[in-house]
Amino acid sequence: MNTNQVSTRQNSLWLIAAMAAPLAKGASGCSWPAVLAMGGFTLLVGWWLGRYRMAQKPWLDILQGLWTSVIISEMLYWCGDCWPSHGNGKAAALILLALSTWSACRERQQAARVGCMLIWPVGLLLGLILLSAAPEVKLQYLYPTWQMPDAALVTVLLLTTLYTGKGKGESAGVCVGFLCFAMITAVVAAGTLSPYVSSTSKAGLYELSRSISFFGVSQRLESVAAAGMTIGYFGGISYLLSIPEEAANRGRMVLAYGALAGLLFAMNIRLDSRIIAVGSILLWIIFPAVCSLKNLFQKPPKTA
């Protein structure tokens, strides 16, 4: 969670570009009450992390890095789901991983500049899909119902909270923005596809792009959705791989974590998304809290 080598604003822009596609994937499979509940939980976690000190042990850094590889391998599956009609989703995902690893191997400031540039294509392409589908929303599909939230959404929301500067004022606004984006995506996906279809689809935004019509004429925007999501996953994977910035062997760590993610994906070793979510909560919230019981309720010193 070290972000001191890039400015807070730069980190926020990079994080927006990196997490927009994973967040859209998770939110498109959830009902809006579930998104609201999970968003409120992660905002509370962000406030807590910003208010109280959390210890970080070397062994915990290693476990978090290994678990990050598991999350990245899951993102590769999400990327492959964006290209179901082409039959080469696995190859596209592996190429994406190679490019993301190459980007992350450079200095973090350079990777951040590249990541910030992604906010424009990701925002425009995903925004086009959501705006085009909004007129197709049926109000009867938006009746409040509770569905167990997609565990992928839990993991992504947790990541957005962890890497936004630990509760600083400008970062709190980014977290609220992520929650609003997730709510809009959930409402548009469920209102257009129906709650059942959106919750059972592997790639809700891709399915959403097939249900758009202009003036009664059906439009096929699958390529637009797939391109926007793929660019977003590139940003997300490169961001996660770029997190270890202060280690002397940073380049080798990035290559090792990227290789582990690729190996898990190539060998079809995939954990259930609920296990990934529980593991993320344990490694980034529970274990650090247990390791820092002495200063858990000690407020951090004020900075000038």
Label the predicted regions.
Residues 72-81, 120-144, 189-190, 290-302:
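Hydrophobic alpha-helical segments and their helix-loop junctions in multi-pass secondary transporters
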